[in-house]
Amino acid sequence: MVRISGVDLPRNKRIQIGLTSIFGIGNTSADKILTTANLSPDIRCSDLTDEQVSSLRTIIDESYQTEGDLRRVYSLNIKRLTEIGSAAGRRHRVNLPVRGQRTRTNARTRKGKVKTAVAKKKGR
């Protein structure tokens, strides 16, 4: 089992796809990492030698922000936006879409389940 940046890479997948399971590394970053390490993207994760794994670890640790560090940066950025009271921060605070999407219809993922209005009783 190959473990890089605290993530177990899937054994049966190609190393290029396996690297994308690390938060902060996508297809382009995986290509750059493999080029720097002189590895073929077609190698399976289970076929990597200890030497190759250690070279991948050093490249990722030196050049990329991944996993917990990157998640912390994201959350601090959102916290900063809410504290300064920017438009984006206000949208984050009330759980609405931040980047100008419509909300009259749709936006259910961000807004949550539909809250139905309760009808008033007549005659009282």
Swiss-Prot record:
Q: Where is the composition biased (Basic residues)?
A: 101-124
Which PROSITE patterns does the UniProt record give? Answer: RIBOSOMAL_S13_1 (PS00646), RIBOSOMAL_S13_2 (PS50159)
Cysteines engaged in disulfide bonds, as pairs? none
InterPro entries associated with the record:
Rbsml_uS13_C, Ribosomal_uS13, Ribosomal_uS13-like_H2TH, Ribosomal_uS13_bac-type, Ribosomal_uS13_CS
Q: Where in the cell is it found?
A: Plastid, Chloroplast
For this UniProt record, give its keywords in alphabetical order, as a comma-separated list: Chloroplast, Plastid, Ribonucleoprotein, Ribosomal protein, RNA-binding, rRNA-binding
Region of interest: Disordered: 100-124
Q: Name one GO molecular function term.
A: structural constituent of ribosome
The family database entries (Gene3D superfamilies) matched by this protein are listed as: 1.10.8.50, 30s ribosomal protein s13, domain 2
One Pfam family per UniProt? Ribosomal_S13
According to its UniProt entry, the protein's GO biological process terms are: translation
Transmembrane parts of this sequence: none
Q: Name one GO cellular component term.
A: mitochondrion
Q: What's its job?
A: Located at the top of the head of the 30S subunit, it contacts several helices of the 16S rRNA.
Q: Which PANTHER family does the record match to this protein?
A: 30S RIBOSOMAL PROTEIN S13/40S RIBOSOMAL PROTEIN S18 (PTHR10871), SMALL RIBOSOMAL SUBUNIT PROTEIN US13M (PTHR10871:SF1)
HAMAP family, from UniProt?
Ribosomal_uS13 (MF_01315)
Quaternary state and interactors: Part of the 30S ribosomal subunit.
Q: Which family does it belong to?
A: Belongs to the universal ribosomal protein uS13 family.
What is the name of this protein? Small ribosomal subunit protein uS13c
* Gene symbol of the encoding locus: rps13
